[in-house]
Structure formats: C-alpha cells, structure tokens
Regions:
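Rhodanese-like catalytic fold shared by cysteine-dependent sulfurtransferases
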Residues: 1-43, 51-84, 94-129
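Conserved beta/loop motifs at nucleotide-recognition and modification sites
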Residues: 46
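Short, surface-exposed ligand- or partner-binding patches at beta-edge/loop junctions that are enriched
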Residues: 87-88
C-alpha cells in the first residue's frame, strides 16, 4: 500500500515534465474561455476543418483555412500575429499541431479549443451556417 502511494505521488510530481516532453504543453481553452478571449481581446477564431464541415456550422466570425491548405495560406492571417488566436477543429485533436505551426511562424498567443466545435456546441454556444 505504501509503495503504491509512493509511485502515484512520484508520477503526479513528474507529470508536468512528462507532459511537456510529450508535447502536451499546447495551451488549451474551453468554450467559455474562448468567448472571453473573443469578446475581451478580439481573438481570431481559426477553423481548420474542411469547407464542407465549416459550411455545416461554425463559430460566428471564424476564419476557415482547411488544415491541408494552412501552410500555404499563413500570409492571410499575418496581420493577426499580435492578437490571440483560438484554433478550432472538429474535436480538438488537430488544433494542437496547428498551434505548434503558428508558434514556429511567429504567432504569439495561440490556443487550442478544447473539444473543438463539438465542445462549443455542447456548451450551447451559437454557430452560424
């Protein structure tokens, strides 16, 4: 019992380091935090889903650049480098990689929307078509 407690405690103490090494340090925001960034700091919402998914429903005022096109279209969002950017995908899985790409290209504050559009809808927040 004591050994098990020691192992669990050790894992908990090491978790921040391990998660950083595994790339889990991508800043995430939930839907409520994203709304605050949008309203208070004029954050850009970048939706990296394909055009069909975007047309079916997206966060109001989101800009759509499908993930396969993003690298070639970064110039379109250059003017937003000084603003927070919330990356949105279907479930939140792809947006972490996009955050890394934007960081490497000089974008300062980038956040992955936890749960993606699904989390947004689940929080009963508006979508437009």
């Amino acid at each position: 019992m004591l050994f098990g407690t020691a192992v669990v405690t050790g894992v908990m103490l090491m978790w921040p380091l391990v998660s950083r090494l595994l790339g889990a340090s991508t800043p995430q925001v939930g839907p409520t935090e994203a709304v605050q960034l949008i309203n208070r700091r004029d954050a850009l919402v970048l939706d990296v889903r394909d055009k069909t998914d975007f047309a079916a429903g997206h966060i109001p005022n989101a800009r759509n650049i499908p993930l396969p096109e993003l690298d070639g279209r970064l110039r379109e969002i250059e003017k937003f480098k000084a603003r927070p950017i919330v990356i949105n995908c279907q479930s939140g899985a792809r947006s972490a990689g996009v955050c890394g790409l934007l960081k490497k290209n000089g974008f300062g504050e980038v956040f992955s929307l936890r749960g993606g559009i699904g989390g947004w809808v689940e929080a009963s927040l508006p979508v437009e078509k």
